[in-house]
Amino acid sequence: SRGISRYITKKNRHNTPSRLELRKFCPFCCKHMIHAEIKK
């Protein structure tokens, strides 16, 4: 895949302390992929 596809979402850290995973369309892969939250 060329580059990294990123999605910006707002999340409540109190409700979801674990890593957020979203099934979104990846423009680099041209298909739906699971976009996990990037560890900070």
Swiss-Prot record:
Q: Report the principal subcellular site.
A: plastid
Intracellular or extracellular location(s): Plastid, Chloroplast
Please give the Pfam families that the UniProt record associates with this protein.
Ribosomal_L33
* Protein name, UniProt field: Large ribosomal subunit protein bL33c
InterPro entries membership:
Ribosomal_bL33, Ribosomal_bL33_CS, Ribosomal_bL33_sf, Ribosomal_zn-bd
Signal peptide positions are none
Gene3D superfamilies, sorted: Ribosomal protein L33
Coiled-coil regions in this chain?
A: none
* The entry's keywords: Chloroplast, Plastid, Ribonucleoprotein, Ribosomal protein
Record-stated family: Belongs to the bacterial ribosomal protein bL33 family.
Q: Name one GO cellular component term.
A: chloroplast
GO terms, molecular function: structural constituent of ribosome
NCBIfam families in alphabetical order: PRK00504.1, PRK00595.1, rpmG_bact
Q: What is the lineage of its organism?
A: Eukaryota, Viridiplantae, Streptophyta, Embryophyta, Tracheophyta
GO BP field:
translation
